[in-house]
Amino acid sequence: MEEMMMNDPSAMVIYEEEVTTAPNLPCSLIQQRSWDEEKPIGYELTNTKCYKTPNGVQKTATIQREQLSTSKDFGEQQIVEMDGEFSIEGTDMHAIPCTSSSMQPSTSSNPSSGEHQPVPLRRMAIKIGQRVLRFKVISAEEAPEAPLDTQDSWINDPKPVTTPKALAGLYRCTNCKTYFGNKEVYQRHIQEVHGDARPFRCFNCGMRFANKTSMTHHLKDHSLLKPMFSCDYCPRIFSKLESKTRHHKMHFTRSTCQTCMRFFTTEDALRHHQSTAHPATFDSGPPPEDLLPNGKSARYSCSYCNLRFHFKKDMLVHERIHTGEKPYSCGYCMKSFAQSQALTAHIRTHTKELPYGCGKCDKRFRDNSCLRKHELAAHTDEPIVRPISVAYSNQVQKQMQRQRENRRKQELLIAERHPYRI
């Protein structure tokens, strides 16, 4: 739909009747004459539909109705004046004269007077660009009941724009179902009318969301088929099983603050909480016996010895010493290892790869531990000191001694049961 240029941008909508005219037609203006000279006439718009204007905001144009006594008031240039806002006049908007011989006004005189009488137009069309606006000139008896001197619009209750062709390219507000032809006007409408611009609304509770993802996540709370997992020891409810399992660990751990009865997954988190939230009752002395020398809690203990670990994976790797399990095997020589790091370092003996280089000389090494030993031995005067406490070192030595004794007992037991295998 083509845009109409106006003097006042506030008048956004004009109603038109689209008339298809071919170039070979003899006349593009439909004129009918009547001999009803003295009856006042008015204007009425027929077959209206919405017209899109440059700024895209739709408003109804108010048109001034006038009472004209005769058709002498119709000039060749001035046709209709619209409430002082703009006028259809001049060469931009003018009546197209009829050039057809069949449509020329008759020059014969009135039988009663013998002279040619001025006749009011019964219908005329105004062409704007390639569009034709058609107006109907009616008599006072055919005019609406409203007084002609009022400033009301001629068009009462115009039909809304609902055709897909008319709605193409418009911006639709999801809150109030209003259409806009300009993006800036649409965004300003969202901010001024609907507040914080949350177009997505939950049909269950009325909550609004800024994006569809948030609304979809919210709709899960209304689902009747949503699984619920409740804790067996407290009234808390969880929507996921893993959340419930993680919560259960807090009931079985000893990491509980006795001041506020809060649960913590680790002993370190509990001590940090006590030092910050309850500094008056916090004991900053040596850690209890169930803590490792590095300050971490000893949550896992070996099934074969009394050695304790903070992480479960460290305990599993340690137990391979007792079981003799070596799950990692080399693809070159089929040699097996208990740890993946040992296998990686062994494979480099086959590939001759030396990824770790010394920054002070040109020597390179297979792993980082060899590089560290080289730096301490060749480039520093300090002796190699292992970062481990004396008490922890003695504990490890005792555990290794017990492991050797247990292994010797197992070998003797096997020898007694199978004496011929030795």
UniProtKB/Swiss-Prot annotation:
Segments for region (Disordered): 95-119
InterPro entries named among the record's database cross-references: Znf_C2H2_sf (IPR036236), Znf_C2H2_type (IPR013087)
Coiled-coil portions: none
Tissue-level expression: Expressed in vulval cells and all somatic gonad structures such as spermatheca, sheath cells, uterine cells and distal tip cells.
Positions with biased composition (Low complexity): 99-113
Subcellular localization(s) per the UniProt record: Nucleus
Alphabetical GO biological process terms: regulation of transcription by RNA polymerase II
Zn finger limits (C2H2-type): 171-194, 200-222, 229-251, 255-278, 300-322, 328-350, 356-379
GO molecular function: DNA-binding transcription activator activity, RNA polymerase II-specific; RNA polymerase II cis-regulatory region sequence-specific DNA binding; zinc ion binding
Outcome of gene disruption: No visible phenotype. Double knockout with lin-35 results in sterility, defects in gonad migration and vulval morphology.
Keyword terms, alphabetized: DNA-binding, Metal-binding, Nucleus, Repeat, Transcription, Transcription regulation, Zinc, Zinc-finger
Any one cellular-component term (Gene Ontology): nucleus
Functional description taken from the UniProt entry: Probable zinc finger transcription factor that acts as a transcriptional repressor. Acts redundantly with the transcriptional repressor lin-35 to control the development of somatic gonad lineages. May, in addition, suppress sensitivity to RNAi.
Protein name: Zinc finger protein zfp-2
Species the sequence originates in: Caenorhabditis elegans
Encoding gene (name): zfp-2
